[in-house]
Amino acid sequence: LLEDSFGRQFHYLRLSVTEACNFRCQYCLPDGYDGPSSDHFMSLPEIDTLLKAFARLGTSKVRLTGGEPTLRRDFLDILHLTASTPGIERVAMTTHGARMEKFAANWKAAGLHQVNVSIDSLDPRQFAAITGQDKLKAVLRGLDAAIDCGLDVKVNSVLLNDFSDSRLQRFLAWLKEMPVTLRFIELMETGDLHQFFNKQHQSGSPLKATLMKMGWQPLIRRKDAGPAQEFYHPDYAGRIGLIMPYSKDFCKSCNRLRVSAPGKLHLCLFSENGIDMRELLAGGNVDEVVLFLQKVLGQKHETHYLHEGKTGATKHLAMLGG
């Protein structure tokens, strides 16, 4: 098993397959993507070697992220490869959802279990203002397609000062009938967005108090679950999650490692630098990658130090997909 010096075990790999994205979300890539081309990112054989090494060390869940992972022409191949790797029991992906109506059934057939979709507002104008794309209706049709074909669906929504007041009531009315988990995520500070963070960051604690007053009850976490505190209500088809990285003890339950699209291992979303694995992966020797991973895990810190204002090497969230 992969275990660090603080006794945390890592069952969960977040694998970024591209940094490119065709949305321009205010909290991520407000000016659009202007990074390296696709040949800068790991190839299918390199991803295969990586997955085999992680699986051998006890990784049972893999999430494919970006950027927007579906922009890779070989995304379906990556998905099938991940799902067919012995030891990988659960495959998830994070997407903006604009291509989901067309492809959800194909993803399911390739081995996908869960999809997380970013929806920061149910108001079309707000959605377009936040994302730079007038695609809310297409995304919502995609959600229906994902549910219809049996995928486990979660919706991610970033807490922002500008858009918070009317959003909650609209989302709650939506959750009455929608069997999805809606997770509100505190805005995280990244290297490129200090001013935006200072203006827009909102703690999730008041929202948690509001939900508890309304009768929402906490759920027990699964072994391979993410960092969300999840809540249910008997009158609602959907659930609500809160992801609050600035809260006390957030890092104690850390169970995931990250690999960026260019093949760097990030021991934390906010670590000072990634550890380059590309040459090792190109060699194709799974045993060597296993030894490397066991060796470097001792470098993982106890916490992300976000509360001290440190943002590490993450310039924007498209680099690692959260």
What would you call each of these model-derived segments?
Residues 5-45, 269:
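Canonical Radical SAM [4Fe-4S] cluster-binding loop centered on the CxxxCxxC motif
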Residues 44-64, 68-185:
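Radical SAM/AdoMet-radical enzyme domain recognition
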Residues 33-37, 101, 123-130, 191-195, ...:
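A short acidic, helix-capping loop that chelates divalent metal ions and anchors anionic groups
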Residues 1-13, 173, 177, 187-322:
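Auxiliary Fe-S-binding modules of radical SAM enzymes
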Residues 23, 124-125, 249, 275:
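Glycine-centered loop/turn positions within well-structured domains
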